Amino acid sequence: MIVIGTKCQLHQPVTQELTAAAVGSGALPVFGTPFMCALMENAAMTCLQSFLEEGLGSVGTRLEVSHDAPTPVGMEVWAEA
C-alpha cells in the first residue's frame, strides 16, 4: 500500500547534454524542458517503486508544467514527488 505523504526528491546537475540546445527544444545552453519533465516523472517513479511488487511500474499519463526560469549549465535542479 502506498503511504500518503511519501516524498522523493531527485537532484540533477545541469550539463551540456541536458540543455535545450542539445535536445533541440531551444537554442540556449540552459536546462531543457524535456529533461525537466523526465526528471519530474523519474522522481514520481522512484517514489512509487518501493510500494510496488517486483515487475510492476508506473506510467505518466498527463503533465501540466510551467518552466518559469532558465537554469544554466553548472547549476543544479531538483524535482520532488
What role is predicted for each listed range?
Residues 81:
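Conserved catalytic core of two-component histidine kinases
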Residues 1-32:
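Catalytic strand-loop segment that frames the active site of acyl-thioester-processing enzymes
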Residues 44-78:
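Hydrophobic beta-strand-centered segment that forms part of the acyl-chain substrate-binding groove
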Residues 30-35, 72:
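Residues at secondary-structure transition points
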